[in-house]
Each structure stands twice: as structure tokens, then as C-alpha cells.
Amino acid sequence: MAHKKAGGSSRNGRDSAGRRLGVKKYGGQEVIPGNIIVRQRGTKVNPGANVGMGKDHTLFALTEGRVVFAKKSGGKAFVSVEPIAKAAE
């Protein structure tokens, strides 16, 4: 009697969706309070002036202004928000 044993299932074939990490607002772009500037795992970029950090290390704007990226001594990257001087009305 012809017979073929059941084939084993493949152990591959899974992949997780991308996490959509990275810089969301680049240097020179204007932001309002609450805008996400960087989504990251760990502190690749540290918060500077007028920037807050969420529990998942997301950096966000605390004030209205323009995004500025900078490298400090030791190679640490920082992002801050410089308030835009409004013209006197």
C-alpha cells in the first residue's frame, strides 16, 4: 500500500510588524506642545530645553518653537525646542 508520512510544518514563516521608530520632526521644523519629535528605544537622543520624555523614551515638545538637534561632548545627541520670537503686534 503506497503511503507517505505527514510532512512536518516549517519552523519559519513569522515576522513582526515594524515599530515605526525614528525622527518625526527634523531640525528647523516648527512644533507645537505635544508634538512627537523622536520615537526611540532607549535614549539614542536625549531631551534638551523644552523637550519632555515619555516612559517609552519618546521625546516630545513642551512649548511652541523650532526643533534643534545638537551633539554635546562625549558624543551625546540632544534635541531641544527654541521658542520662536513673535513679531510685536
UniProtKB/Swiss-Prot annotation:
One of its GO terms (cellular component) is cytosolic large ribosomal subunit. One of its GO terms (molecular function) is structural constituent of ribosome. One of its GO terms (biological process) is translation. Coiled coil: none annotated. InterPro entries: Ribosomal_bL27 (IPR001684), Ribosomal_bL27_CS (IPR018261). Residues 1-24 are annotated as: Disordered. Keywords: Ribonucleoprotein, Ribosomal protein. It holds the Pfam family Ribosomal_L27. It comes from the Bacteria. The keyword Acetylation does not apply. Signal peptide: none annotated. The keyword Ribonucleoprotein applies. Belongs to the bacterial ribosomal protein bL27 family. This is Large ribosomal subunit protein bL27. The gene is rpmA.
